[in-house]
A protein has these predicted regions:
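Acidic, metal-coordinating helix/loop segments flanking the phosphotransfer/catalytic sites
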Residues: 26, 51-69
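Two-component/phosphorelay signaling modules centered on CheY-like receiver
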Residues: 32-50
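The feature encodes the CheY-like receiver
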Residues: 35, 77, 105
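Acidic catalytic/metal-coordinating carboxylates
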Residues: 54, 80-83
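Short amphipathic alpha-helix used as the core "switch/output" element in two-component signaling
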Residues: 60, 75, 82-94, 111
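Active-site residues of response regulator receiver
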Residues: 73, 101
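C-terminal output helix
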Residues: 107, 121, 125-135
Length: 151
């Protein structure tokens, strides 16, 4: 027997909106273990993820889908993560990008930030720092997303 719900009960309707409005992150790293770690961590934060192994795949995914956040490795098989940051700044300026690299020198961090990266992480990735970075990026992006939704 099905229980009836009051006509004003919006719990189920609101729940379905929440489930379909998940934010999406693009992860670019040529190391499968790092990609998997990032996918699992962001998935537990209720983000959908897509992954690319190189610049070419990343550009293809960016052209096909909308993303709320991008995490990219500095050194990729077909170029530099800085190239991707510059591409995103030109084509998708509202998309926050964080650089992840094993080469954690101050010069590298400054280069990433000058290119337009939102933030910078070093490998091995500190998961607490990653979660903070992701939460901050999504909070800062929220006003942009709300403005884009206004007719």
């Amino acid at each position: 027997m099905l229980a009836s719900r009051p006509e004003g009960d919006t719990r189920f309707r609101n729940q379905s909106k929440t489930m379909t409005a998940r934010q999406k992150a693009l992860i670019i790293d040529d190391e499968p273990d790092i990609r998997e770690l990032l996918e699992i961590t962001l998935g537990r934060m209720k983000l959908d993820t897509r992954s690319a192994r190189n610049l070419k795949e990343a550009r293809e995914l960016l052209a096909r889908e909308h993303y709320d956040l991008c995490l990219t490795d500095m050194r990729l098989p077909d170029g530099s993560g800085l190239e991707l940051v510059q591409h995103i700044q030109q084509q998708y300026p509202q998309l926050p990008v964080a650089m992840i690299t094993a080469y954690g020198s101050l010069d590298t961090a400054i280069g990433a930030l000058k290119a337009g990266a939102f933030d910078f992480l070093t490998k091995p990735v500190d998961l607490n720092r990653l979660r903070e970075l992701v939460s901050t990026a999504l909070r800062l992006r929220a006003p942009d997303a709300a403005l884009m939704a206004v007719p």
